[in-house]
């Protein structure tokens, strides 16, 4: 009998490096990726602020982010109106940049081998951790409901959410509203997590051919990370639009 070994490695999916802070279990790899992404966003904001205030020729990075800001502004103008909700623009752009950088960190070829001989990414995508995406989605959930209360009133907003466009569908509208942060987070988590699974499977290829599919997928991963960041920010704008909609109001 001939035995064929298809894989001598071990596939580890969804594993995180954990530690205990103040009695709570913390995924340190997610915290590290999130902190680095936040630091890059803040540094990028100060850099672009300096460029905007200067009188020199705009650099390529400035033009790139200006194009993103214009795109977000157009979406907000058509969905809500900049005069009604100007605060949504910096929020949407910040969320886009933050998620984009978080996703792109995993593309960096930084790996190490642990004591068990398993090769692990130093900077994994924070969006591959369900805690990260749920926290981000619930933050958006709270923000657009606060905006809805500011726009419609503390009584008018809950009534409008339950009533929706068809009053007798109030129970369904309530379930839909509760599931919004779940669907928003799982959409991002599923795509990024699936990418991590594929990279893990590619790592099982023989070393002499592994570089080719890995390079192709890493390139595609840049595109997927950008698309998912854009979708998350666009849905954020859409949820703000729904929460701040007022009947028979003309701007």
From Swiss-Prot:
Its main location: membrane. Key component of the proton channel; it plays a direct role in the translocation of protons across the membrane. The keyword DNA repair does not apply. This is ATP synthase subunit a. Belongs to the ATPase A chain family. It is a multi-pass membrane protein. GO terms for biological process: proton motive force-driven plasma membrane ATP synthesis. Gene3D superfamilies: ATP synthase, F0 complex, subunit A. The chain crosses the membrane at residues 28-48, 84-104, 130-150, 192-212, 220-240. The keyword Transmembrane helix applies. It comes from Mycobacterium leprae (strain TN). It is found in: Cell membrane. Pfam families: ATP-synt_A. F-type ATPases have 2 components, CF(1) - the catalytic core - and CF(0) - the membrane proton channel. CF(1) has five subunits: alpha(3), beta(3), gamma(1), delta(1), epsilon(1). CF(0) has three main subunits: a(1), b(2) and c(9-12). The alpha and beta chains form an alternating ring which encloses part of the gamma chain. CF(1) is attached to CF(0) by a central stalk formed by the gamma and epsilon chains, while a peripheral stalk is formed by the delta and b chains. Keywords: ATP synthesis, Cell membrane, CF(0), Hydrogen ion transport, Ion transport, Membrane, Transmembrane, Transmembrane helix, Transport. It comes from the Bacteria.
